[in-house]
Amino acid sequence: MCGLVGIFAGNSAPWARRALLEPMLARLQHRGPDAWGTWVGSGVALGHVRLSIVDLVAGHQPFLRDDCVLVYNGEVYNHIELRAELEALGEHFQTRSDTEVVLVALRRFGSQALARFNGQFALLFWNARTRTLTAARDRYGVRPLYHLEHQGAVYFASETKAFDAIPNYRRAICPEGLLEHGLLWNTLGTRTVFKGIQSLEAGTAVVFGATESPKTYRYHQLGEGTPHPLPGSFAEAKVQLRSMLANAVRLRLRSDVPVGNYLSGGIDSSVTTLLTDELRTDRFQAFAIAFEDGAYDESHYQQMMAKRLNVDLVSIRITDALIRDNFEKAVWHAERPLFRTAPIPLLLLAEVVRAAGIRVVLTGEAADEILWGYDAFKELKLLRFWAKFPNSKLRPQLIRTLYPHLAHYRDGRQFGLMRMFYEGFLGSYDNDLVGLNLRVHNNKILLNYLPRDCRPADLDGWLLDRVRQSLPPDWQQWSLLRKNQFLEMRTLLQGYLLSSQADRMSLAHGVEGRYPFLDHELLEWLFQLPDQFKLPLLSQKHLLRETFRANLPSEIVDRPKQPYQAPDLKAFFEGGRLGKLMNERLSPDAVAAAGLFDAAAVERFRGKFARGMPPQVGYRDNMLASFLLSTQVVAAQLQQPWTGPVRPSSPRTVDLIEEGKP
């Protein structure tokens, strides 16, 4: 992966625009530590920091050809097939890079080329003939792209921190964005947690012209216009899943640098590592996270799978102190409040990967969303059962079956709370947004910490209107579980997991994550399968488990799902007492200075733990600890001056000014 920046329609002198690109890129150097370059044209300027993966010699950016310029963050995995298609149409190529294929395809087909790309990317494409700048993002929002209008120009960047280099500008937290992010774990549409900064939506392109208003094109929407369910048997679906997933892995192994795998110990990464092993002829490395705290540790299963495949397993052992000491660094890279500490071990793992000489890793990300592995899918079925059979004696057993990894639900008092929770939703179990409502219900505890003037009078109506604006036209034709998949992908996956835990943490150390389960052909096919193939009764990821049952250890195939988590509130205690980081960032003075939370409410929360760590901490307190602390860290970091370099320190491979040359 890489990092990109751009300036459009600025009225400054060319040399001034070139000078501004440099400090913007310096703030993104971690995304592309190998090389950097800039190009300045008439009314437009583009910059790029490169993580070299394909065509290491000739793939430098900005890439220029035929009056077109491209800066591009990501990969198009089917570039070999696209190259052959374009050559058959009479096109010729000067390099082996996928970057040139993307540029030629965009020049020839315009925005329609985006639907031909199988990959994860964000890009800025300047066409001098039409004098238009196209900004585009991949189907599922794997790679970020932001834009900001300021003093007559539009600025673009892979991360918002690059905008802090703009004269007379400083990022500030948007209260509405913070509220929406807190309730949904994401902001919807183009909104971000920062005032004035917009995120390009996944699956869209925006075309900026010198004399016209920007035009937005949506080239992809999950499930839109897709007939379902597909005909065919479960046995046929297993064969097809294996074939399509193997092809997704094959495409994502294309690289001119070494490729490794993440191995968590769950079935998702075990499958991608298995298929990698089948497709490769050489021995490769797998990387894993082990925890000092046995409640989170899955190293037994990681070692089992590594031994089964005879791969080299490299592990990092995570302690509470490592989480605590690296929390602020993770927040700086994430650029948003965190709801848990899970990103920090991934940040540290990426450092180990880079030190091992690996720049690309395949992971099992997104399998839970597309194959229905989350508890949320089972919760919907449980709600339906409770509504239909209100007097069933199976209710207690169903709750314990639903949450086997949460030991405290075995306690009678906790079960009573769970029963009240579910009964409170019985009247709306058939509401098409009930899955999202469950998450919002859990997160409304955050409202106790926000000033009252930050909340809309009709909060539920405001939020539901925001959600419904993002729904596809044929939404009502989908099953309830398909609707929940869409909502999970648009909120939790796209806005949080792919950003805070994936893109930002891996690229903090110049490591590109690739996600076979997000292959769009695979995902669209799975979306059309009958619901019972993916979740019969309460059997999560049933199709995936049965497809690979013969190839994986039964202990991995049949083990209850253990969500990837890390110690949250517990990690911020030192010597049995609440530690320095929490006490300083959540002090009354610090909270008042940031002006985002009710200082008295935050002080009551901190006071709950003044005497030490309680024996049990629930979901809400863990979530609150991470959210309150990380929001305060974001606010503090926004006030800190940049002390890094004024330009990237790697070799400059492109430096062109095509307007006002001296």
Please identify what each model-predicted range represents.
Residues 299-300, 327-328, 372-377, 571:
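Short aromatic-enriched loop/helix-cap "lid" or pocket-rim segments at secondary-structure transitions
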Residues 338-340:
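Acceptor-substrate binding/catalytic loop of class I
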Residues 1-3, 22-23, 88, 165, ...:
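Adenosyl-5′-phosphate
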Residues 19, 236, 240, 244, ...:
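Generic recognition of stable, solvent-exposed alpha-helical segments in well-folded globular domains
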Residues 1-335, 346, 549-550, 555, ...:
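Cysteine-centered catalytic environments shared across enzyme families
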Residues 80, 132-134, 143-144, 164, ...:
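Short catalytic/ligand-binding loop motif for oxyanion handling, primarily in non-cytosolic enzymes
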Residues 348-410, 499-522:
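Active-site adenylate/phosphate-handling loop in enzymes that bind or generate adenylated species
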Residues 330-332, 375-382, 643-646:
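Short secondary-structure boundary/capping segments
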